[in-house]
């Protein structure tokens, strides 16, 4: 039995089970990957939309399901759920074609049944994506590539791992966070995009805590803040090396330009000490001995001077009636 015969045998099984209540569409389909379609349809693998049969369009029209038509798809065996849009109604009756990444998220095998029902989702405002590998971040402008690729999607579901194709390379991206709900519509929505560190990066594999002194991983590419390390390299010019300090100390002994450093003239004729210079320091013991000797000499000189001054003062002191006297008898 070929695929067409198998599909015809399923028509009686799946048709007529599409009403889940007033205004609600629900039906079972056999799931097959996009690769079962002609080659010109294989580009649908890097999108988030499915193909349904024409009978599904008729049923949706009778139920007045309005555009955009969004669906919740689930695997009744594993219980996995996701969301999607519909691109065309050209599939064979009883068949639903899905991108391979979507089947992998739902843990579906070829030909297994899936439940499809219409859904109403809020417009998304924020999405955080985590690439599986770092090569996606190495693209010159990954954010622009992602925003352009998301035009092929109608919905996003938290924890799904979507696939996009860029320059003949497949990139797998995990949906880490969504706002305002865990499943959103991105059709005509103004959505902010952010990146988590890739799964194979150190920022994603190393545990992070918020305790003081620990590194905290930030958004986008894993910038790291933290306290300054004590073993960090010195800032240039902030700390001198030993040989530099020695050279600086040696340079202090070298003559430098000093203003008014000429020899001064004194009124008493003695040679003055040049301004801006200071006599070299001598040994403290010699200085003390010299100072003591100088003090003793000064004391002796002072004593001699005082004696000489006393004798001079006595000789030059005015004395009354000190002349030679004469008697009247003479």
Swiss-Prot record:
Keywords: Ubl conjugation pathway. GO terms for cellular component: VCP-NPL4-UFD1 AAA ATPase complex. It comes from the Eukaryota. It holds the Pfam family UFD1_N1. GO terms for molecular function: polyubiquitin modification-dependent protein binding. The keyword RNA-binding does not apply. One of its GO terms (biological process) is ubiquitin-dependent protein catabolic process. The keyword Signal does not apply. Signal peptide: none annotated. Residues 206-222, 283-310 have a biased composition (Low complexity). Pathway: Protein degradation; proteasomal ubiquitin-dependent pathway. Residues 198-330 are annotated as: Disordered. Belongs to the UFD1 family. Functions at a post-ubiquitation step in the ubiquitin fusion degradation (UFD) pathway. This is Ubiquitin fusion degradation protein 1 homolog. The gene is ufd1.
